[in-house]
Regions:
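Membrane-proximal alpha-helical signals and transmembrane carboxylates
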Residues: 1-174
Length: 174
């Protein structure tokens, strides 16, 4: 999962990176299966430069499943910068599910019942249901389409943490 928000100095990106030893079944009992990296900068290019200087692994956004946006980045000015950044990232697929939250930090540090990452959990809500139970998610393709039409974003499902639970509001689409 990738989270995007506004910080005092510009923007913040949160990367939830699953531990590959967990994904391959080689986890150690005391290790956290998901790590969250938070980086901030004046713009998204600066954040990416900080990532490239500080991380040994290539930032592969080709496996991105979920994009979670804080409420401030949805405002005019910030959303244009975000859409511009996402469109130039050629590895981000348009079938990524998009959510909004006013609890970006809490959502990214939420621990699922099976210690799944936030991205895996939200993607599972979308895709692992019988046809009658499926939720209508909003994809990045729909975000791009509406943004190109009139400069706004579609209504996005909201996600938040309530106690130990992660809750999702799909609005009238439920």
């Amino acid at each position: 999962a990738l989270g995007a928000g506004v910080s005092e100095n510009g923007f913040v990106l949160k990367y939830a990176m699953p531990d590959m030893s967990t994904a391959t079944g080689q986890e150690k009992p005391d290790e956290d299966p998901v790590s969250v990296l938070t980086l901030s900068g004046r713009d998204f290019q600066e954040i990416e430069a900080v990532y490239n200087r500080s991380q040994e692994k290539f930032l592969d956004l080709g496996h991105l499943e979920v994009l979670i946006l804080d409420e401030q980045i949805l405002e005019e000015g910030a959303r244009e910068a975000l859409i511009g950044y996402l469109k130039q990232e050629e590895h981000i697929g348009e079938d990524v599910y998009v959510f909004r939250t006013d609890m970006l930090g809490d959502v990214f540090h939420w621990k699922g019942a099976r210690k799944s990452s936030i991205g895996e959990y939200l993607q599972g809500i979308q895709e692992n249901r019988t046809s009658g139970q499926q939720k209508k998610g909003v994809t990045l393709r729909e975000v791009y389409h509406q943004f190109c039409q009139d400069g706004t974003l579609p209504w996005l499902p909201e996600v938040w943490v309530e106690g130990e639970l992660l809750e999702v509001d799909y609005g009238s689409n439920e």
